[in-house]
């Protein structure tokens, strides 16, 4: 596994981050396809054995049970100073309403730390932009979380570049803790972040940690082939349904490049993303150990410029999706 420094922080992270939405009690939350604890623990253990030290979860994943499962596994399989743990706040969980008010942030971080069984998280991220709370209130509350030692850093996820620029400017103006990561929607078939968000992150030294790097499984198999999860994944359908025809052309080229390299589609799609400027660690998901082993090898795969061009050329502008 390769490692790099995460943006303007002192955190040394693996070039891949394990996304933990897959882990959670199926009876809790709105994802019936998640893995219960007994199935999640072997994957988390194998992740650590494979060199990944970066884990991303959220308060709302499976109504908090993702944090519980991940926290117990990391306590059993690793020392706290060996891992980098990120979680999120915004979405509704339990009786905590959706939003980023001061009260919601301060309660959410305490609840997350309790579920994780940790004294602090390395990164607390805002999951989405809150249109009902003044951004100054949100940013000051996040700063207070850092000052209290409950989070070492703060990050953001999926928003308009203009919103992110506004937040960064306010943090500078007030001397508040800055956002150090942007978790955005970025993969071979969704590259809208290249227009404004990625240049902003480069300029500000913000590390990019993309979600859905394999387009929720669409870049791992022949186009049109389905799985039980794809059939039941309403979020994925909303993200990619409108661009299906154009995306199929990219998937065909991905298959060709993969065959030429003797690699899998997933490995090539990840290698492409890892090669992009500013991308610190794509957030991968795995529901089986063999899936994880396949993805671990992607960071050692180097694409030639002509192969990158082959993959990128068919791309056409997409509707902005993943946030409002």
Say what each PLM segment does.
Residues 113-133:
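Active-site groove signature of glycoside hydrolases
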């Amino acid at each position: 596994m390769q490692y790099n420094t995460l943006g303007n922080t002192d955190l040394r992270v693996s070039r891949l981050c394990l996304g933990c939405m897959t882990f959670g009690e199926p009876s809790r939350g709105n994802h019936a396809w998640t893995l219960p604890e007994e199935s999640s623990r072997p994957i988390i253990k194998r992740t650590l054995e494979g060199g990944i030290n970066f884990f991303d979860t959220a308060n709302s994943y499976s109504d908090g049970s993702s944090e519980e499962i991940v926290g117990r596994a990391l306590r059993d399989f690793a020392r706290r100073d060996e891992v980098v743990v990120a979680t999120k706040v915004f979405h509704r969980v339990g009786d905590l309403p959706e939003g980023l008010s001061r009260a919601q942030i301060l309660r959410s971080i305490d609840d997350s730390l309790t579920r994780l069984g940790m004294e602090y998280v390395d990164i607390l991220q805002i999951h989405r932009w809150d249109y009902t709370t003044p951004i100054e209130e949100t940013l000051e509350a996040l700063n207070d979380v850092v000052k209290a030692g409950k989070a070492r850093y703060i990050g953001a996820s999926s928003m308009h570049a203009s919103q992110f620029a506004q937040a960064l400017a306010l943090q500078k103006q007030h001397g508040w803790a800055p956002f150090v990561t942007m978790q955005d929607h970025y993969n071979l078939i969704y590259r809208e972040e290249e227009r404004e968000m990625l240049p902003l992150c480069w300029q500000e030294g913000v590390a990019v940690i993309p979600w859905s790097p394999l387009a929720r499984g669409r870049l791992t198999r022949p186009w049109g082939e389905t799985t039980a999860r794809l059939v039941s994944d309403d979020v994925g359908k909303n993200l990619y349904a409108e661009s299906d025809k154009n995306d199929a052309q990219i998937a065909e080229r991905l298959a060709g490049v993969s065959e030429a390299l003797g690699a899998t589609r997933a490995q090539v799609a990840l290698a492409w993303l890892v090669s992009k400027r500013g991308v610190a660690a794509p957030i991968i998901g795995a529901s089986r150990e063999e899936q994880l082993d396949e993805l671990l090898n992607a960071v050692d795969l180097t694409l030639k410029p002509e192969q990158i061009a082959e993959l990128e050329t068919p791309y056409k502008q997409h509707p902005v999706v993943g946030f409002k």
